[in-house]
Design a protein with these regions (language model features):
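Short, composition-biased local secondary-structure segments
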Residues: 160-177, 197, 253-271, 325-327
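Exposed alpha-helical structural elements
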Residues: 144, 232-233, 322, 326
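Terminal accessory/targeting
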Residues: 2-186, 197, 204-213, 335-372
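Alpha-helical, coiled-coil/dimerization segments enriched in small aliphatic residues
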Residues: 189-190
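Charged/polar, solvent-exposed surface patches and flexible loops
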Residues: 51, 83, 87, 94, ...
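Short, intrinsically disordered/low-complexity patches at protein termini
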Residues: 267-269, 329-330, 364, 372
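Active-site-adjacent pocket scaffolds in enzyme catalytic domains
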Residues: 20-47, 291, 296-334
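Metal-dependent polysaccharide deacetylase catalytic core of the NodB/CE4 family, i.e.
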Residues: 116, 120-122, 128, 132-136, ...
Length: 372
């Protein structure tokens, strides 16, 4: 198996891979079954878990030089990469065990796994036969998981010099890793949009679906809305939703001299104008914040709210449907978590309805925003 993994790693390094700025996506039409039951969700989940575990195992055969080459970086933080890999393996094992609970209904991709060693063994020999019912999915999935893994490894390699959602700095920070199985939370960044815009459509759509989400607003955008439409209109916009803060401007809060004022001004504005919707959460743009900021957030009673599943809907290289397909693939892989969209992007008008339709019969839950 070691020899096979070595050659797999060599092919990864020598083969053409997408540029770091091109996010991974997976055409879900290559998967031959609709997710019309919890059991079929589990079948697809087991497949994505094993495919990603195989990619993760292959990456561990690369030495530091080869890993730098693969990630396109001159220096990398190996400690953070190792920590990320360990966390990923732990989540994969837990998720595979959860996905195995429906094997009595459909045994596809059900293998004997009683611990980490056996999971790694199954990942090492995981492959799809040429005559398999799932053969059309095999190669697109392999490419997706390699590219997605590289996204995550690259963030870990740069951490903490460039902070991101890949790691937590302390107890004042959270993501969705502790959420229950099959439970997801919707969040939207960088709004509100210009009037009228996607934010208006989105909050109305969510209310019609009897759903709620957390909107992380920018102070300057909220102020523009307030000046144009007034307090009552802004309150009506976010009726039934939760509103956190993302700072006054959409820029990194890790090296900005006025980062504290940015957060304080935005928090004061939201508390004053839409106090009933305010939740004490800060979402750092790009996930970038200072390593020593925990004391500030604690003093302000704020929790740093990160995410697990990035829709990458701001990327010009992804269409709305590709963004939704990326999210669904990662929902199958991680089985729970916080999903991050941007309500300033028109793509969400297509992506969110597509996602809800694709998962409507999968036995998933959408967490109320006040619980996040």
């Amino acid at each position: 198996m070691r020899i096979a993994l070595f050659f797999s790693a060599m092919l990864v390094c020598l083969g053409a891979v997408a540029a770091p700025n091109e996010p991974a996506t997976l055409d879900r039409s290559t998967w031959p079954e609709q997710l019309i039951s919890p059991a079929l969700f589990d079948v697809a989940s087991r497949a994505e878990i094993l495919a990603f575990a195989h990619a993760l195992l292959v990456s561990e055969t690369l030495d530091e030089s080869a890993l730098k080459q693969r990630l396109g970086l001159k220096t990398i933080n190996l400690d953070t990469i190792d920590n990320l890999r360990k966390r990923m393996w732990q989540r994969l094992l837990a998720n595979y065990n959860l996905a195995q609970q429906s094997c009595d209904q459909d045994a596809s991709f059900c293998y004997y796994v009683d611990g980490m060693d056996s999971l790694r063994e199954q990942a090492g020999k995981f492959e799809i036969a040429d005559d398999s019912f799932y053969v059309a999915w095999a190669e697109p999935s392999r490419e997706f998981h390699q590219r997605y893994l590289d996204e995550q490894l690259r963030k870990a390699a740069l951490f903490p010099q460039i902070s991101s959602e890949i790691e937590l700095f302390g107890e004042q920070e959270s993501n969705g890793e502790a959420m229950h199985d099959r439970l997801f939370s919707l969040t939207f960044d960088s709004g509100p949009s210009q009037l009228p815009g996607t934010t208006d459509w989105l909050t109305d759509y969510l209310r019609k679906q009897s759903m709620s989400a957390t909107f992380f607003v920018l102070g300057n955008s909220a102020q523009v809305r307030l000046d144009k439409s007034g307090t009552q209109a802004l309150q009506a916009l976010y009726k039934g939703q939760c509103v956190g803060v993302q700072g006054w401007e959409y820029r990194s809060h890790s090296h900005w001299q006025d980062w504290q004022d940015s957060i304080l001004r935005t928090t004061a504005l939201v508390k004053q104008v839409i106090p009933n919707n305010y939740v004490a959460l800060f979402r750092p743009p790009y996930g970038q914040r200072r390593a020593d900021s925990g004391g500030f957030f604690q003093a302000q009673g704020l929790q740093v709210s990160l995410w697990d599943i990035d829709a990458q809907d701001m990327s010009a290289s992804l269409s709305a449907e590709q963004s939704a397909q990326r999210v669904l693939s990662l929902m199958l892989l991680w089985r729970h978590g916080v999903i991050a969209f941007h309500d300033t992007q028109d793509k969400v008008r297509t992506a969110l309805p597509w996602l809800l339709k694709a998962t409507a019969q999968s036995g998933l839950g959408w967490e109320d925003c006040e619980v996040l």
